[in-house]
């Protein structure tokens, strides 16, 4: 199951958008895992207005062993697709294969990324207006599902090392399958990255122990029957069947929810209420629902058309599905809202609100002080030119006593002796750190290892 937190991180990343071909709603959440290793692409049109075709590109990348390869895919794979000759020739199945292979090539050419040991699954679709075609490329155990007349149709298949076709390639490349894992380690048999399993120079990309070459499935679109596409990582599919997910999307549409809200609620359904169960629901979670729009149809009209279909489903409510997924957990005393307590943000108490307001007041006073000069690039360059500046320490401007009093009064305790003379302030650690920083003594400054410059960008979302 991997390392997990004592409480899940429930902040959600959400994106939505629409054009004349597709509409989408994405939600992603770190959950119980120590870090977020998922990424995504959301491109309603990867061509320019001058091009004859209109092609949408969506993808989910589920990282393992780190987030770097997944992040690279989220940031770079659209550009890599646009570089492929096959893409500009309109050969979309070949374009996806070439894109996956060349992503591996570019990772190995990158001086930083070639030393990275992480990898990621990739499930993606191209939707072409002129070809009336949907193409899915998949490597790994993320999954893409098409809803057709309310029924789930698989557009991808999970690549597990126990599958006969996958195991034969692994063994032929001098690998082995042990405990249902590649070389006793990796729980999936296709991925981008994972170069420790692709080190045989005598073998092509499709022959390596772990290959990045995707399975391709083509589907000719029938807009009277084809409704939407769901792309999600295994954090979703470990909890729901493909049909479950299709039914939940239709349920959300009948309830008047947007695609964004539906994706968010599906994550709520799938997040484990505790880590004491089977381990499902404790993974990172990413899901995007892509609406397939008819010519001249907007997302509101599409939603109305979906509601009018009135498909029969076995799903009564989001809460009921959650109770069924986590049947080991006692929800008997929970109403339908309390069932989702683990992903519901708690309202702040008065102490927390007062503390944050006081800290914000001190910070604002410090930033507004005319004596406090921001460290701009020009300042840094000047310091680099002047060796004597390296030994100088920065100091903040005068302390705003009113703000200081607010900080102490809101966050600390004030005590006096029996004569009412001696005053003692008791500060929480966070308030003390803020006070010291305001006075020009940042407690973190003596620990340079805590000063990290981390890029938290986890995906790409762009509307043209």
UniProtKB/Swiss-Prot annotation:
Ranges for region Interaction with IRE1: 174-355
Catalytic activity: O-phospho-L-seryl-[protein] + H2O = L-seryl-[protein] + phosphate; O-phospho-L-threonyl-[protein] + H2O = L-threonyl-[protein] + phosphate
Keywords annotated in UniProt: Cytoplasm, Hydrolase, Magnesium, Manganese, Metal-binding, Nucleus, Phosphoprotein, Protein phosphatase
SMART domains the UniProt entry points to: PP2Cc
Signal peptide limits: none
E.C. number(s) listed in UniProt: 3.1.3.16
Residues reported to bind Mn(2+) 2: 62, 234, 283
Keyword presence, Metal-binding: yes
Subcellular location: Nucleus; Cytoplasm, Cytosol
Biased composition (Polar residues): 386-396
Mutant phenotype after disruption: Double knockout with PTC3 leads to elevated activation of HOG1 during osmostress. Double knockout with PTC3 impairs activation of macroautophagy, genotoxin-induced targeted autophagy (GTA) and the cytoplasm-to-vacuole autophagy pathway. Double knockout with PTC2 also leads to decreased dephosphorylation of ATG13 following induction of autophagy and reduces the association between ATG13 and ATG17.
Domain PPM-type phosphatase: 23-292
Annotated spans, Disordered: 361-398, 434-464
Record annotation: effect of changing residue 234 to A: Disrupts catalytic activity
InterPro entries: PP2C, PP2C_BS, PPM-type-like_dom_sf, PPM-type_phosphatase-like_dom
Amino-acid positions noted as binding Mn(2+) 1 in the UniProt annotation, renumbered to this chain: 62-63
Family: Belongs to the PP2C family.
Protein function: Dephosphorylating regulator for many key proteins. Dephosphorylates the cell cycle master regulator CDC28/cyclin-dependent kinase 1; its activity appears redundant with phosphatase PTC3. Dephosphorylates HOG1 at 'Thr-171', to attenuate activation of the stress-activated p38MAPK cascade; its activity appears redundant with phosphatase PTC3.
Record's protein name: Protein phosphatase 2C homolog 2
Organism: Saccharomyces cerevisiae (strain ATCC 204508 / S288c) (Baker's yeast)
